[in-house]
Amino acid sequence: MVAEARVKASWGANVNIKIPATAEGLKAIRTLSEENIPTNMTLVFSANQALLGALAGATYISIFLGRLDDAGHDGMQVIYDTLDILDNYPELESQVIAASIRHPLHCTQAALAGADIGTIPYSVLMQMIQHPLTDVGIKRFLADWEKVAKKKR
């Protein structure tokens, strides 16, 4: 895992290596962190996994909130717990990624919790930007404009 990560890290300064939240993954994160190679600990499903990743030196911790919810767990609680834990240890600099976002409420909740990053699918982004009252407002503006335009004729 480490040898492959070193090769991929040589591709550019903005490359972050995704490493799974496993015992071997934690060892790799520690080694890569010591070599200043940025890592993203992925497939995180508990605050304990996140803490271990931060202690190992992960640059990013990807908490799969949607998958947790899909399995009947409270994905947001894992994000809240992780952020609370990391707040207790200012020397841990890992950034929390709200991953596997399923709907706009996940985005709102993750932002309120203080997640550093969200991986937002295009479909959710489109849901976030659209609102029925915006559409109604546009129709009203256009109708008002037509009234003004008719008066000028």
Give the predicted meaning of each segment.
Residues 3-4, 28, 46-56, 102-117:
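Catalytic cores of alpha/beta
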Residues 12-23, 38-51, 62-72, 95-100:
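Catalytic beta/alpha-barrel core
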Residues 43, 59-72, 113-134:
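Glycine-rich phosphate-binding active-site loops on the catalytic face of alpha/beta enzymes
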Residues 100-105, 123-127:
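Glycine-rich beta-alpha junction loops
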